[in-house]
Amino acid sequence: MKAGIHPEYKAVNATCSCGNSFEFNSTLGKESIHLDVCDKCHPFYTGKQRIVDTGGRVDRFNKRFGALSSGKK
């Protein structure tokens, strides 16, 4: 390896919005980063996954404006 051309590889502290923090090695220029989700709070990994959109766009439209169109013709 050539000297002086490779970025410095150092420890980085990552803190999640849930409060979980862990350390990893990276060439990132920062000493710490903030994450929105991690494996401790992500719905897929926690098993608390929920279906956000059960209906389609047409169902959502009919739910919002169905009462308006059914009254007059």
From Swiss-Prot:
| BP terms from Gene Ontology | translation
Q: Which GO terms describe its molecular function?
A: metal ion binding; rRNA binding; structural constituent of ribosome
Question: What are the required cofactors?
Answer: Zn(2+)
- Lineage: superkingdom: Bacteria
Q: Which UniProt keywords apply?
A: Metal-binding, Ribonucleoprotein, Ribosomal protein, RNA-binding, rRNA-binding, Zinc
Paste the cofactor note. Answer: Binds 1 zinc ion per subunit.
| Cross-referenced Pfam families | Ribosomal_L31 (PF01197)
GO cellular component, as recorded: ribonucleoprotein complex; ribosome
Positions bound to Zn(2+): 16, 18, 38, 41
Q: Which InterPro entries match?
A: Ribosomal_bL28/bL31-like_sf (IPR034704), Ribosomal_bL31 (IPR002150), Ribosomal_bL31_A (IPR027491), Ribosomal_bL31_sf (IPR042105)
Name the PANTHER family on file: 50S RIBOSOMAL PROTEIN L31, CHLOROPLASTIC, LARGE RIBOSOMAL SUBUNIT PROTEIN BL31A
Q: Into which family does the record put it? A: Belongs to the bacterial ribosomal protein bL31 family. Type A subfamily.
Q: What does this protein do?
A: Binds the 23S rRNA.
Oligomer status and interactors: Part of the 50S ribosomal subunit.
Output the HAMAP family linked to this UniProt entry. Ribosomal_bL31_1
Q: What is this protein called?
A: Large ribosomal subunit protein bL31
What is the native source organism of this protein? Vibrio parahaemolyticus serotype O3:K6 (strain RIMD 2210633)
Q: What is the lineage of its organism?
A: Bacteria, Pseudomonadati, Pseudomonadota, Gammaproteobacteria, Vibrionales
The gene that this protein is the product of is: rpmE
